[in-house]
């Protein structure tokens, strides 16, 4: 290895190759729900569906990953279409009437669980933002900003997000700042 730049470039090429030839093809082939939209989140290494429930934050992560890969790795129309399908699923099924997002839904979008934190919202917002860049559809930039502002409201309004710990042992988690 000549220098650190060559070393970093070698790893960048390895990761890019893995995304193009392994990760993205696998999830496009086995993960996409071609009936209801969105992405299945529990498939085995052979692509067999193990559980049809869908993690909502994973929907956002997948839509972001597809959009980001489209913007930075390869202008693959299948990736952009997968991002759009997943965002359509999110918008149609993953928001509760109070503006918060569910944590988990059935394959056809019926709510199963809702959590006290805003991970689903975080990943949906970055997915919408990146998709706006990939597609040129600025309405998704507006949606991302609106969702981000809603997240700020949830975080800054006492009582909207239930505390994880009781007052007997005050603590502050780092998950929100990491997201």
List the model feature ranges, each with a label.
Residues 1-179:
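Glycan-recognition and catalytic cores of secretory/periplasmic carbohydrate-active enzymes
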């Amino acid at each position: 290895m000549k220098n650190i730049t060559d070393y970093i470039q070698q790893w960048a090429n390895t990761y890019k190759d893995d995304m193009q030839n392994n990760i993205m093809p696998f999830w496009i082939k086995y993960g996409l729900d071609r009936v209801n939209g969105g992405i299945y989140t529990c498939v085995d290494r052979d692509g067999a569906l193990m559980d049809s429930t869908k993690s909502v934050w994973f929907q956002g992560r997948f839509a972001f990953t597809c959009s980001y890969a489209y913007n930075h790795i390869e202008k693959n129309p299948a990736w952009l279409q997968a991002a759009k399908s997943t965002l359509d699923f999110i918008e149609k099924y993953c928001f509760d009437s109070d503006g918060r997002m569910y944590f988990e839904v059935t394959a056809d979008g019926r709510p199963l669980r809702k959590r006290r934190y805003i991970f689903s919202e975080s990943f949906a917002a970055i997915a919408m933002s990146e998709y706006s860049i990939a597609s040129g559809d600025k309405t998704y930039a507006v949606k991302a900003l609106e969702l981000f502002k809603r997240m700020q409201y949830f975080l800054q309004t006492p009582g909207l997000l239930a505390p994880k710990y009781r007052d007997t042992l005050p603590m502050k988690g780092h998950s929100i700042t990491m997201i």
